[in-house]
Amino acid sequence: MKFLFGLLLVSSFAFADCPQLYPDHKPFNIPNTTELCNSFYVSDYDTINHKVIAVSELLKHNFPVGSVKRTNNFHSDDRVGSVPNNRQYLKTHYDKGHMAPADDASSLEEMKETFLLTNMTPQSPTLNRVEWKLLEEKVRGIFDSSKTDVYVVTIAVYENKQTINGLPIPSGYWKIVYADNSQYFFYADNNDDAVVVQRGSVALPSLFK
């Protein structure tokens, strides 16, 4: 499968600690980010502005995705220090919204990794609990019917430069699914009135602001 977004690609000679977790095994070319490798997903994290830019998941064919009980144990990521942390989300309007969903985990270790705060963004509660949750279920349905491994890329778009308690707030999200040589594109704004929209091949907005 070919990763369409040239904006996100680097040359085949670029270094990556976990290239197998990216579509086409090619890391994202996102300035000022640190690659945080986990068991089944990798997060490209901006350690200067304390925000996750993109997450790529590898859902292995025939793995028991979605079979692990949810833990809800949100915790800081020692690889980037004490920020972000749970205190920053206290008394805000926002949920801790997963980039790589907890329900995509197929083991206890994977479940634990999905609750790293480097896998979170401040997300509208309505979007997180309704529209985005339905999209995540739709993606797992695509995976369940797939005959091959599936890659899922989730991108947080930061167009408004808004923050809360030092946490940058995404203006919206893309989710791109690569399954059986097909590609599925979804987008939603990050607000309580948002609706997830499925699109064809698209020109992405600027991702790196």
Residue spans of the language-model regions?
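Sec-dependent N-terminal signal peptides
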Residues: 3-13
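Boundary at the C-terminal end of the N-terminal hydrophobic targeting segment
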Residues: 14-16, 23
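Coil-to-beta-strand transition motifs
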Residues: 19-20, 36-38, 47-54, 169-171, ...
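Short alpha-helical segments and helix-capping/turn motifs at coil-helix boundaries
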Residues: 25-30, 38-42, 138, 172
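Short Gly/Pro-enriched turn/cap motifs at secondary-structure boundaries
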Residues: 31-34, 165-167
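Short, His- and charge-rich active-site/binding loops that engage polyanionic ligands
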Residues: 34-95
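Domain-level detector of nuclease and nuclease-like folds
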Residues: 78-209
